[in-house]
């Protein structure tokens, strides 16, 4: 859908949405986003120009349906997919992508680390995707030298970063905020560095005794990104991997650097969002969101979870959705889903579905709590359908219609029960929603109460007004 929009920009030195917004231009992508979000085009342009909203939209991803991430737009959800050296292939990852889009993923990250042709997998995903695709280029940089940190050069990093841009990647996690002087700060942690990309950069710095090349070559990366309109997702290499490590000196030192990098990218008119934790106790979530807004000048915040407890392997889509809902309420712009397989293995298609639905619930709950216009409309419509025993309408309005119908039909599968005024929980005689109290009933009751002159309800005998 974007081919004609893109062609007239090709050859420009900077094709980013931020660049056009700062010139007062409402691009076709901004206009499209304004309709999707039910926002004025001028507001979308202003928020993009300010850096509070991003529209990840690489010019080489022509089949993309533009979307927005930012405090003025609805809270978004990202789904991670990707092949590992031990599992999956390109066709399986495309199936996961299609499933993720079906269940409402707003963006998808390809986190493939090896075992397959990474370029083939990525290209297949981008070609099949109507939503923005993100990647972590350091994975392929390391794979390109067969896992040898010693052989991995600064130019290797930049070569892979540009390759991802050329292939149409809309945003890349760039772990530029981890500095060599931050590494001693992890000494007191229970779980050290839990970011895969951060771990690669830490190993590189420890071996070469040099500063993080993604930091020292950051201006070069900006030059690459603005030619393709690729968005920075500034990686939090020192995010906490457990409750004990949350909000520690290591995390906050890196966050300060991420704020510096945000403003440096903005000087090049390159779009930025900032990644965040991780594992955070409930009482620290608001602090983390507000601290990011302060340090990073309100660039959109993109958090993984956060998990609010560490004792539930197999259920971390739940432990993290709790934290995600709170983070969204306090101003986080996008939530990265966690599946039931987190910490245990590579998620399959069913895990993708479970994780996504949990996070769509969290994001929607956050939108309601933030009083976004229209956020509760679907809830109210479903509630009216529930009160009217319109079962098919309830299924249709559900986040997961198939699951809702499946659970209903376990005990009452016949079509006749789609008109029944009960489900198997209460049965035909005890459903409280069968008791329909009308306005006329309440008006009659008000007259009786008024006539009683404020008598105690516990002892007063109320005469029915016919």
Curated annotation (Swiss-Prot):
Cofactor binding: number and manner: Binds 1 [4Fe-4S] cluster per subunit. The cluster is coordinated with 3 cysteines and an exchangeable S-adenosyl-L-methionine.
GO cellular component: cytosol
Keyword terms, alphabetized: 4Fe-4S, Iron, Iron-sulfur, Lyase, Metal-binding, S-adenosyl-L-methionine, Thiamine biosynthesis, Zinc
Enzyme Commission number(s) from the entry: 4.1.99.17
Binding residue positions for [4Fe-4S] cluster: 423, 426, 431
GO annotation, biological process: thiamine biosynthetic process; thiamine diphosphate biosynthetic process
Keyword 4Fe-4S: yes
InterPro entries: ThiC, ThiC/Bza_core_dom, ThiC/BzaA/B
GO molecular function, one term: carbon-carbon lyase activity
Pfam families: ThiC_Rad_SAM
Binding site for Zn(2+): 279, 343
Cofactors that this protein relies on: [4Fe-4S] cluster
Catalytic activity: 5-amino-1-(5-phospho-beta-D-ribosyl)imidazole + S-adenosyl-L-methionine = 4-amino-2-methyl-5-(phosphooxymethyl)pyrimidine + CO + 5'-deoxyadenosine + formate + L-methionine + 3 H(+)
Pathway(s): Cofactor biosynthesis; thiamine diphosphate biosynthesis
Residues reported to bind substrate: 80, 109, 139, 175, 195-197, 236-239, 275, 302
NCBIfam families per the UniProt record, alphabetical: PRK09284.1, PRK13352.1, thiC
Family: Belongs to the ThiC family.
Function: Catalyzes the synthesis of the hydroxymethylpyrimidine phosphate (HMP-P) moiety of thiamine from aminoimidazole ribotide (AIR) in a radical S-adenosyl-L-methionine (SAM)-dependent reaction.
Name of the molecule in the record: Phosphomethylpyrimidine synthase
Organism of provenance: Synechococcus sp. (strain RCC307)
């Amino acid at each position: 859908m974007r081919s004609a929009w893109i062609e007239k920009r090709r050859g420009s030195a900077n094709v980013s949405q931020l660049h056009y917004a700062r010139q007062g231009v409402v691009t076709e992508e901004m206009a499209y986003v304004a309709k999707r979000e039910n926002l004025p085009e001028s507001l979308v342009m202003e928020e993009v120009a300010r850096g509070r909203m991003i529209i990840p939209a690489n010019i080489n991803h022509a089949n993309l349906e533009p979307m927005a991430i930012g405090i003025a737009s609805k809270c978004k959800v990202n789904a991670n997919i990707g092949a590992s050296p031990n599992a999956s292939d390109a066709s399986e990852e495309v199936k996961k992508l299609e499933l993720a889009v079906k269940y409402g993923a707003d963006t998808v990250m390809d986190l493939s680390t090896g075992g397959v042709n990474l370029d083939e997998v990525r290209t297949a995903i981008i070609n099949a995707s109507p939503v923005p695709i993100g990647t972590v280029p350091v994975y392929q940089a390391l794979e390109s030298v067969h896992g040898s940190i010693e052989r991995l050069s600064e130019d290797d990093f930049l070569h892979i970063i540009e390759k991802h841009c050329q292939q149409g990647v809309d945003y890349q996690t760039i772990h530029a905020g981890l500095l060599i002087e931050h590494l001693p700060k992890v000494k007191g942690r229970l779980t050290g560095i839990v970011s895969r990309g951060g771990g690669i950069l830490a190993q590189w710095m420890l071996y070469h005794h040099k500063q993080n090349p993604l930091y020292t070559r950051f201006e070069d990366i900006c030059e690459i990104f603005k030619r393709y309109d690729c968005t920075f997702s500034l990686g939090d290499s020192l995010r906490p991997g457990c409750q004990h490590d949350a909000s520690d000196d290591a995390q906050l030192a890196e966050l300060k650097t991420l704020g510096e990098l945000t403003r440096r990218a903005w000087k090049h008119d390159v779009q930025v969002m900032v990644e965040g934790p991780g594992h955070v106790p409930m009482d620290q979530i608001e602090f983390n969101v507000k601290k990011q807004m302060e340090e990073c000048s309100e660039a959109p915040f993109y958090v993984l979870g956060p998990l609010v407890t560490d004792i539930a392997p197999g259920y971390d889509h739940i432990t993290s959705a709790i934290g995600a809902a709170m983070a969204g309420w306090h101003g986080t712009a996008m939530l990265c889903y966690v599946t039931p397989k987190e910490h245990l293995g590579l998620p399959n298609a069913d895990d993708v579905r479970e994780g996504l639905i949990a996070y769509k619930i969290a994001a929607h709950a956050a939108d309601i709590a933030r009083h976004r216009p229209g956020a509760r409309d679907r809830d109210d419509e479903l509630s009216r359908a529930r009160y009217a025993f319109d079962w098919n309408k309830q299924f249709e309005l559900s986040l997961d219609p198939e699951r809702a119908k499946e659970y209903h039909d376990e005990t009452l599968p016949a079509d006749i029960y789609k008109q029944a005024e009960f489900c198997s929980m209460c049965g035909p005689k005890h459903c409280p929603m069968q008791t329909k109290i009308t306005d006329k009933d309440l008006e009659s009751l008000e007259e009786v109460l008024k006539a009683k002159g404020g008598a105690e309800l516990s002892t007063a005998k109320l005469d029915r007004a016919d």
